[in-house]
């Protein structure tokens, strides 16, 4: 067989795409396609080929279009039909709907598939549909492995830079403040630390309760250090008694001296290292009244210190949870607020979901109409999406950030102001700013410059750094968080990490990107609507200020 050309035309005879495999001019191809239109209008729709004096047209109609192979009259018609079937499969894999614009948009991929199926001499390659897809994807296993290796190297290098920065900051603190053992008060307390005489203990507590704040902090650290040294050889009862006595002494000392408003006490290095960051609480399982739809989105973003957006990425998932078998034969209709044909989104349906129905009618339904969704009250992800915005594009930014840093006049450190602005229609909860430093002095939250009155230090340790929490940021609210923190140099304050979350339970709620549910209907009767609930949520994953 020899294929002269492969073309796509409308039923009215308008040529859309054509690929010539022999030396045919454009005018000659247009003339042949015009002749085909005249021939096909004179025969019934049951035929699959027509001929004139010079060539044979093997064709297949689909919607308002024709796929046409122009061959010589001596070509094997059986092989021509097999080739036409392969062309049809390949074209269908690229088109979500049969429209002129969709065909033009995927013209490069369609023509490339033509070249894979038929060589330039007009002879069909011995390929299957799967092989054509593999060749067109142009994936390389070795290239993927190399990309993974390079990505892992970048991650390791980033972690190593952070670790070295923390180590430099720690050494700088030690160099500035010296070791605690050089402090005279520490040595004096250490001589009597092993004494069990209650008179000696009371005398030491009484002395340090009226001492300076620096001396009090030194004494507390020495107490923790002594307890840590004795702990391995002490009995459990004795350990608990010493812990209780130490806590009592700490309360007495803490009552003798005041702190500035908003200042948070600094826990000792030993207590912080042993306790670590408390594990996050387990999420409550929301109540399900029959059909519960969860729309979850996670945002990653990176800002410069002046607020410029370097990158942003959003990932989302739509989960379906059913606990009633009578409601399992259902379909989900998406609202008009989301455009499933938006090329800036990457949508991916579950393998059991009818993708054609999703793209054409925004309907989430099973491919096998005889089956139903599981009614085991377990969440099932049926749709995922991803969107990446270019630099300086704020379309995926729910919370903008700008930082201002200046040397502090009151102590060795920096005055930091973090300006923020929320663009959400709902409030953000549990907004936590984490600075990767572990200061020796307490963090002072400036209540005069801060617009958030509930800001507080919630964690300080050598591994995570210092975390300051704002319980909530109102919808479309802008404000500032101001504080003074000790750091060896300005770059040690970065990268700052911000975490937040937002959740709404409302049937009419829509996600940050506009994903929402219009209705839930029976699979066999779209006029019968079913009751359902919707929960939308937005969380940050890696939200950084570099």
From Swiss-Prot:
It is found in: Cytoplasm; Golgi apparatus membrane; Cytoplasmic vesicle, COPI-coated vesicle membrane. Oligomeric complex that consists of at least the alpha, beta, beta', gamma, delta, epsilon and zeta subunits. Interacts with DSL1. InterPro entries: AP2_Mu_C_sf, AP_mu_sigma_su, Coatomer_dsu, Longin-like_dom_sf, MHD. Keywords: Cytoplasm, Cytoplasmic vesicle, ER-Golgi transport, Golgi apparatus, Membrane, Phosphoprotein, Protein transport, Transport. Its main location: cytoplasm. This is Coatomer subunit delta. Residues 236-287 are annotated as: Disordered. The gene is RET2. Belongs to the adaptor complexes medium subunit family. Delta-COP subfamily. Residues 190-440 are annotated as: Interaction with DSL1.
């Amino acid at each position: 067989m020899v294929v002269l050309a492969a073309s796509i035309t409308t039923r009215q005879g308008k040529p859309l795409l054509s690929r010539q495999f022999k030396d045919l001019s454009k005018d000659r191809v247009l003339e042949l396609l015009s002749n085909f239109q005249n021939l096909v209008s004179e025969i019934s729709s049951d035929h699959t080929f027509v001929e004139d004096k010079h060539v044979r047209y093997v064709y297949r109609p689909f919607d308002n279009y024709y796929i046409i192979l122009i061959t010589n009259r001596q070509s094997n018609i059986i092989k021509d039909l097999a080739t036409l079937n392969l062309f049809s499969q390949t074209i269908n894999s690229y088109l979500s709907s049969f429209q002129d614009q969709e065909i033009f948009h995927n013209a490069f991929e369609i023509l490339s598939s033509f070249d894979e199926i038929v060589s330039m001499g007009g002879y069909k390659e011995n390929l299957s549909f799967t092989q054509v897809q593999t060749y067109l994807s142009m994936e390389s296993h070795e290239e993927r492995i190399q990309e993974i290796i390079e990505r892992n190297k970048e991650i390791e290098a980033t972690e190593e830079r952070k670790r070295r920065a923390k180590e430099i900051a720690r050494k700088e603190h030690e160099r500035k403040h010296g070791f605690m053992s050089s402090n005279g008060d520490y040595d004096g307390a250490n001589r009597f630390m092993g004494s069990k005489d209650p008179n000696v203990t009371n005398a030491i507590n009484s002395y340090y309760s009226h001492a300076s704040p620096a001396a009090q902090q030194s004494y507390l650290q020495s107490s923790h250090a002594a307890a840590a040294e004795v702990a391995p050889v002490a009995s459990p009862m004795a350990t608990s008694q010493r812990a209780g006595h130490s806590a009592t002494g700490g309360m007495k000392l803490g009552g003798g001296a005041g702190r500035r408003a908003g200042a948070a006490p600094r826990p000792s290095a030993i207590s912080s290292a042993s306790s670590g960051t408390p594990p996050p609480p387990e999420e409550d399982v929301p109540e399900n009244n029959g059909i519960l739809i969860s729309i979850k989105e996670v945002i990653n973003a990176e800002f410069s210190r002046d607020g410029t957006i370097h990158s942003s990425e959003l990932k989302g998932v739509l989960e379906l949870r059913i606990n009633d078998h009578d409601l399992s034969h259902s379909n989900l209709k998406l609202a008009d607020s989301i455009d499933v044909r938006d090329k800036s989104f990457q949508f991916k349906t579950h393998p059991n979901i009818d993708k054609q129905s999703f793209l054409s009618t925004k309907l989430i339904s099973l491919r096998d109409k005889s089956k139903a969704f599981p009614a085991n009250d377990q969440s099932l992800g049926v749709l995922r999406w991803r969107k990446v915005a270019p630099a300086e594009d704020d379309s995926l930014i729910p919370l903008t950030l700008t930082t201002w840093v200046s040397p502090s006049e009151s102590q060795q450190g920096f005055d930091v102001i973090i300006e923020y602005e929320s663009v959400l229609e709902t409030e953000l909860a549990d907004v936590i700013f984490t600075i990767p430093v572990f200061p020796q002095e307490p963090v002072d939250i400036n209540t005069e410059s801060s617009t958030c009155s509930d800001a507080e230090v919630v964690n300080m340790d050598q591994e995570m750094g210092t975390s300051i929490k704002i319980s909530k940021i109102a919808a479309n609210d802008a404000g500032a968080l101001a504080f003074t923190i000790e750091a060896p140099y300005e770059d040690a304050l970065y990268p700052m990490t911000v975490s937040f979350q937002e959740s709404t339970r409302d049937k009419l709620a829509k996600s940050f990107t506009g994903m929402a549910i219009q209705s839930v209907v029976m699979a066999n009767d779209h006029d019968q609507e079913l009751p359902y609930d919707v929960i939308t949520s937005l969380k940050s994953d890696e939200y950084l200020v570099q």
